[in-house]
Structures are given as C-alpha cells and as structure tokens.
Amino acid sequence: MTIPKDNTQLENARRLRREMTPHERKLWYLFLHKYPVKIYKQRIIGRFIVDFYCASARLVIELDGSQHYTEQGKCYDKERTAMIEAYGVQVLRFSNWEVDSNLAGVCQTIAQTIHARLTSMPPAQE
C-alpha cells in the first residue's frame, strides 16, 4: 500500500527538520541517524508529520512532550495513531522523560521493533 502525503505540509516538515526539539536531537544524533536501516526525520504520512519514520519497517517513532498528556492531546494522538496504523504502519511512542532517563531502553525497543517488523513482513514501497 502506498502511503499518501499531504504536500501542503512540505514546508512545515522542512522547518521541523531544521528545528528539532532537544529530545528529538538527542535520539537522532545518539542513535537513529547512524542506524543501519534508513530512518527519516519529520516525514509526512497522510496529513500528519511524524517525528521519525522507518519506511522499510513501516514504523513511526513519536516523542511526546507534555502537550500529549492533556485530554485534547490524548484524543488527537489516538485519532492520529489510528489513521497512521490504517496504512499498515506501527506507531511507537516514547515520552521525553523516557528519552532523558532511559535512552538505552528506548533505543533497544526501537531496534527490536524494527528487527521484528523487517523479519515478519515483505519489503515496503515508499
């Protein structure tokens, strides 16, 4: 299944790539950018911009700050996750606190999930 992309979000995605949050930068530079499977920053999936996307594993990695824990944020994230998962993409969510306090555990979960998805599914088309 080809994943649609809302091209009106291109400029916003480019800006977000340049202006990563401290937690996104930490995960990117200490782990994701050198991971042996290509992972993209601030990728457009449907009408959403996700923090990180591994196309070959069809995996989204999201880092959640405090706004995600309000009732409105929880509802939005639930809708967003359901729409992304409808494309056959799994969504992993980590809090900023987890990135700060347990980066090794976050990285291990990401690596295990990518490995499991790559060994259990046919190659994805981007």
Regions found by a protein language model. Give the residues of each.
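Nucleic-acid endo/exonuclease domains
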Residues: 1-126
